From Swiss-Prot:
The gene is yidC. PANTHER family: CYTOCHROME C OXIDASE ASSEMBLY PROTEIN COX18, MITOCHONDRIAL (PTHR12428:SF65), OXA1 (PTHR12428). It is a multi-pass membrane protein. Required for the insertion and/or proper folding and/or complex formation of integral membrane proteins into the membrane. Involved in integration of membrane proteins that insert both dependently and independently of the Sec translocase complex, as well as at least some lipoproteins. Aids folding of multispanning membrane proteins. The lineage of its organism: Bacteria, Pseudomonadati, Pseudomonadota, Alphaproteobacteria, Hyphomicrobiales. It comes from the Bacteria. Disulfide bonds: none annotated. GO terms for biological process: protein insertion into membrane; protein transport. This is Membrane protein insertase YidC. Pfam families: 60KD_IMP, YidC_periplas. Belongs to the OXA1/ALB3/YidC family. Type 1 subfamily. Its main location: membrane. The chain crosses the membrane at residues 7-27, 367-387, 441-461, 486-506, 530-550. Residues 41-69 have a biased composition (Low complexity). GO terms for molecular function: membrane insertase activity.
């Protein structure tokens, strides 16, 4: 019985300690490091003025931008633009370079306060944290000037980009090559960029399309090793992920030539990606430049296409820019046949558990309208799925408790003869038809479930700012209350390491009660471990997302109920009330 209990709580402890290690040894130091780096970058940022001339090839640095430091409004106002207005997005397209460099997400705010500013995804290069996408061409001598970062396009069709009204931009160079770019947008986050190239010149021209996602500086949001942020793409059917730190330390990463695939930059909740023409080969490259300020660039370069005099060609790119909503990303993956585009969301190693778990939670959310309730119902479903295994576990624990007196007799009989004791114990298990390892399998199986749930709560945007009841306004953030100031009654917060919210306390109480369901271990070390473990876990989980803590508290409650029912059926005494009573009863001093 004690062995099963010990295995159970050791397994839980290891699971949580791994997550806590990520939090304290990686997340917090990285938060401080990123904050300091961002502050230094903002103090020292200087970029050389832009120069004209030949457009750079993909994988090379863009011509420098204007000196950063302009406000976003100033940078947007100084160039001619085409407005973007959809149910999900607002912003504009810069007619210089036809850049997507002004984009905000209407449905998402910076904080849980609905009056807080909406999320800004793209900003012009002239701002401190420029972030944009663009599509251009590399030509030969016969092609003349081709569309690139400095090209000024003319709006020739449409006035505002909406789901119902595409816009057309045109550019004709000195060699008689006309580029007509039609841009359309759906109700969510996918732009279609279709270029029609007509050669009215006297010589054939060779053109290679390229597409870039460029970001100045690393994002200031804290990074964490539980998910990937940075460069992402699919080449040759394989997912390519390169973090910011890795690309800073190494040469550019070139996944290689591929037919079919995509590339871009991903954050925890947002992403920018380009899907090149899928029927022709192209190269993908991830690069980092330090020409004045850190610049991260993901780009592709397509194979050259020859357009004869009097002939035309068409090049179609897709640009994703927005929130990584699961249903939207899955729809794009299927509708546009984009290879592994669903990998834009980092489901982790246990994706085969994480994805179904999210879909289950999303189903219950749509049913009940609250993700907190969805977590509770999902926990019940998971409990039902694992009920046969858990039933065996608790039945085994109950049987172990029944033979506890016989085990104690064997220990006295064999004393220090460990080999003899082990053989006698195995014979006892055989006679009583007890499998001492029966309680381990449910625990081992449930560990991936725990990690999968943590992943769902942490990385899915659907959980961001999702409220529960009462004071929990964001299930993806820690419980905001703290016992230090009597849960808000006193006018101070206290040190961060003492922040202990109501839900972590509830979780600690349920864990304490669950452990008191069984007799206190005779071994003093185990007894001390069982006594202090709930308190330690309470403080450790205080910094975890509230949704995970609520899950743990609810799971403990269901486990207590399940264990009580099984123990009653097995005729085994439930020690909970005796153990609680013993906490307030003075133990007699041992006789001298």
């Amino acid at each position: 019985m004690m062995e099963n209990n010990r295995n159970y709580f050791v397994a839980i402890a290891l699971s949580v300690l791994i997550l806590v290690a990520w939090q304290y040894f990686y997340v917090n130091p990285r938060m401080d490091k990123d904050r300091i780096a961002a502050e230094k970058a903002q103090q020292t940022q200087q970029v050389q003025p832009q120069q004209g001339g030949q457009q750079p090839a993909p994988g090379q640095a863009l011509p420098g931008g204007a000196v950063p430091g302009e406000s976003r409004d100033q940078a947007v106002a100084k160039s001619a633009r085409v407005a973007i207005d959809t149910p999900a997005l607002s912003g504009s397209i810069n007619l210089t370079g036809a850049r997507f460099d002004d984009l905000k997400l209407k449905g998402y705010h910076e904080t849980v306060d609905p009056k807080s500013p909406v999320i800004t995804l793209f900003s012009p290069a002239e701002t401190a944290d420029g972030y944009f996408t663009e599509i251009g061409y590399i030509g030969n001598d016969a092609s003349g000037s081709v569309p690139g970062p400095q090209t000024v396009w003319t709006l020739s069709g449409g006035e505002k980009l909406t789901p119902a009204t595409p816009v057309t931009l045109t550019y004709t160079n000195d060699k008689g090559i006309t580029f007509a770019r039609t841009i359309s947008i759906d109700e969510n986050y996918m732009f279609q960029v279709v270029d029609s190239i007509k050669n009215d010149g006297s010589a054939p021209v060779s053109l290679s399309s390229y597409g870039r996602v460029t970001r100045f500086n690393k994002p200031t949001t804290p990074s964490i090793y539980v998910l990937h942020e940075g460069f992402i793409g699919v080449a040759g059917g394989s997912l390519q992920e390169v973090g910011y730190s890795k690309i800073e330390e190494n040469l550019p990463v070139e996944p290689g030539k591929t037919t079919g695939g995509w590339h871009g930059i991903t954050d925890k909740y947002w992403a920018a990606a380009i899907v090149p023409p899928q029927e022709t080969p192209f190269d993908i490259r991830f690069s980092h430049f330090t020409d004045g300020r850190p610049r991260f660039q993901s780009d592709y370069k397509g194979d050259a296409v020859t357009v004869a005099p009097g002939q035309s060609a068409e090049v179609k790119n897709l640009v994703f820019a927005g929130a990584k909503e699961v249903q939207v990303v899955d729809t794009y993956t299927t509708a546009y046949a984009i290879p592994k585009f669903e990998k834009l969301i980092d489901w982790g190693w246990f994706w085969f558990i994480t994805q179904p778990m999210f879909k289950m939670m999303d189903f219950f959310f749509r049913l009940f309208g609250n993700f907190g309730v969805a977590i509770l119902v999902t926990t019940i479903v998971v409990k039902l799925i694992f009920f046969p295994l858990a039933n065996k576990q608790y039945a085994s624990m109950a049987n172990m408790k029944k033979v506890q007196p016989k085990m104690e007799e064997l220990k006295k009989k064999f004393g220090d003869d460990r080999m003899g004791l082990q053989q006698a114990m195995m014979q006892l298990y055989k006679d009583e038809k007890i499998n001492p390892l029966a309680g381990c399998w449910p625990i081992l199986i449930q560990i991936p479930v725990f990690f999968a749930l943590y992943k769902v709560i942490y990385i899915t945007i659907e959980m961001r700012h999702a409220p529960f009841f009462g004071w929990i306004r964001d299930l993806s953030a820690p419980d905001p209350t703290t016992i230090v100031n009597l849960f808000g009654l006193l006018p101070f917060d206290g040190p961060a390491f003492l922040h202990l919210g109501i839900w972590p306390i509830i979780m600690g109480v349920t864990m304490f009660l669950q452990m008191r369901m069984n007799p206190t271990p005779p071994d003093p070390t185990q007894a001390m471990l069982f006594t202090w473990m709930p308190l330690v876990f309470t403080f450790m989980l205080a910094s975890f997302p509230a949704g995970l803590v609520i899950y743990w508290a609810w799971n403990n409650t269901l486990s207590i109920t399940q264990q009580s029912i099984i123990m009653k059926r097995q005729g085994v005494k439930i020690e909970l009330f005796d153990n609680l009573k013993g906490l307030f009863t003075k133990r007699p001093k041992p006789a001298e």
